[in-house]
């Protein structure tokens, strides 16, 4: 049997970078999905729906190949904080998040080419921001780093280092819960296991407290 290829339905540079950590036969494709939130749609339902829609948006995929899609949202006071529309929006978002806890939710959807409906996982991580100054916010915005990110920040940004504490999956906060992804892929008989837990922790220099539980199938993260 030919080696399966993987199709990542994402424009995210961070997700593409993370998949570069492994020797997979990768294809990248954009998913043209309307990301608007439905009226009265709960944040968790929203992020689940978008991951599914993105995964199903790629068609004509070979039967043994895999489509992977994800969506990430930042939730503060039950409200979704999306990608900033401009610098002023980014500033206000970071002010609202400052010195407060919030939730980052990433949903990942996987389907094989011969499958209509994707398998779905969601990872929810509680994140606490530090008490950064207004001047630090403005300097960070000048770097343009926050402009394409949910919640207007990147947990891995070493200069701004916005996060003071979080519990769980760092990769999920970056946009792809890799252990949840691996757990889902292992359901398929033609998938060759990848040691994502070891690779992820090595790349991020982070000892994940939930990786063993996730791979074991526990409902954590």
Enumerate the predicted regions with their spans:
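A short beta-strand-loop structural module common to alpha/beta enzyme folds
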Residues: 26-36
């Amino acid at each position: 049997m030919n080696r399966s290829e993987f199709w990542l339905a994402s424009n995210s540079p961070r997700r593409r970078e993370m998949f570069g950590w492994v020797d997979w036969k990768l294809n990248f494709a954009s998913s043209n999905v309307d990301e608007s939130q439905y009226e009265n749609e709960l944040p968790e339902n929203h992020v689940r729906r978008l991951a599914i829609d993105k995964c199903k948006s790629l068609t004509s995929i070979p039967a043994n190949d895999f489509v992977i899609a994800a969506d990430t949202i930042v939730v503060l006071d039950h409200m979704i904080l999306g990608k900033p529309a401009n610098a002023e929006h980014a500033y206000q978002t970071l002010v609202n998040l400052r010195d407060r806890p919030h939730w980052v939710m990433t949903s990942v959807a996987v389907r094989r080419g011969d499958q209509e409906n994707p398998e779905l996982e969601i990872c929810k991580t509680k994140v606490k921001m530090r008490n950064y100054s207004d001047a630090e916010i403005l300097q960070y915005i000048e770097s343009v780093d926050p402009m394409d990110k949910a919640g207007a920040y990147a947990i891995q940004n070493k200069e701004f280092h916005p996060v003071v504490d979080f519990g769980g999956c760092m990769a999920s906060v970056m946009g792809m819960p890799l252990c949840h992804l691996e757990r889902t892929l292992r359901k398929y008989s033609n998938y060759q296991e990848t040691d994502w837990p070891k690779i992820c922790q090595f790349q991020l220099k982070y000892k994940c407290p939930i990786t063993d539980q996730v791979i074991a199938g526990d409902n954590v993260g």
